[in-house]
A protein has these predicted regions:
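Catalytic-core regions of core metabolic enzymes
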Residues: 1-298
Length: 298
């Protein structure tokens, strides 16, 4: 089953002719993702790698190809409008990779998407991967920038605010012989489209997902909200990791949202609350998979 995406998901890439977008569109194609369209204003009629048609607008791309998901590789000043254009075109899943989108722009996007049929993942995220059954997990769906080859098809769901920690958890699981159902990078900005709790809910309802790794960091209360929800509603084993244990209060650490503001924003407080809610907490990044397997009884 997986969540959000599978091998049948049809993808368009906004910003496909930029160097970053082109690089990762090419990698997604090689992974086996059904990349059916690209969008760059003024480049309509061209083809990406002589295969994928490029359109001037998202609505034209959706009408011509039936794309159901979009990956956005658009510079920060234009990314909010790119998200809204995809939503207006009826794209079901919008994955925004762009980092550095102004907070006011994201507030406008968040309000505009309220009640919309479109789901936003990101911004400032690595995207999603549902591994395939081929060699190095090829044949699945890769949207974003995550390295596909470290994945393996299996039964562990991964949700994370951090891209690199997502890859670390995935690699550990794969090395130990345990694959992933879907890996979701929700992004590290203070305002994002999809949070930990929503992804946990999807994993909880997914018959293919048997266990979950949830990775968070200092700042905000998303992990705390998710843990308290899971205590009441999630029957599947969860391991958690919170980054930023040595971060000084009031200083941003990497992600725009990674800043200690309130009492429950610290790594120590989040780890304590996760443990109180029945989540097995890994003390270091290298312990994430091992901690899950211990809780899972594997």
């Amino acid at each position: 089953m997986a969540i959000l995406i599978d091998e049948n998901t049809t993808l368009l890439v906004q910003g496909i002719t930029g160097s970053f977008g082109a690089r990762h569109a090419s990698l997604s194609l090689a992974y086996g993702t059904k990349l059916v369209a690209g969008v760059t204003p003024g480049k309509g009629g061209q083809k990406f790698e002589n295969i994928v048609p490029i359109f001037n607008t998202v609505s034209k791309a959706v009408n011509e190809t039936g794309a159901t998901a979009s990956a956005i590789f658009v510079p920060p000043p234009f990314a909010a409008d790119a998200i809204l254009e995809a939503a207006d075109a009826g794209v079901e899943l919008i994955v925004c990779i762009t980092e550095g989108i102004p907070v006011m722009d994201m507030m406008r996007v968040k309000e505009a998407l309220r009640g919309s049929k479109s789901r936003l993942v990101g911004p400032n995220c690595p995207g999603l991967v549902t591994p395939g059954l081929g060699e190095k997990s090829h044949g699945g769906c890769r949207i974003g920038i995550a390295p596909g080859y470290i994945h393996k098809r299996g039964n562990v769901g991964v949700v994370s605010r951090s891209g690199t920690l997502t890859y670390e958890a995935v690699f550990q699981l794969t090395q130990l012989g345990y694959g992933q159902s879907t890996c979701v990078g929700i992004g590290g900005d203070p305002i994002n489209g999809t949070n930990h709790l929503e992804v946990l809910d999807m994993f909880n309802n997914d018959p293919e997902t048997e266990a979950i790794i949830m990775i968070g960091e200092i700042g905000g209360n998303a992990e705390v909200d998710a843990a308290r929800w899971a205590q009441q509603h999630c029957k599947k084993p969860i391991a958690g990791f919170i980054a930023g244990a040595t971060a000084p209060p009031g200083r941003r650490m990497g992600h725009a949202g990674a800043i200690v503001g309130g009492e429950e924003d610290t790594a120590q407080a989040k780890k304590r609350i996760l443990a109180e809610c029945g989540i097995a907490v890994a003390e270091t990044p290298s312990d994430m998979a091992k901690t899950l397997l211990e809780r899972w009884g594997k």
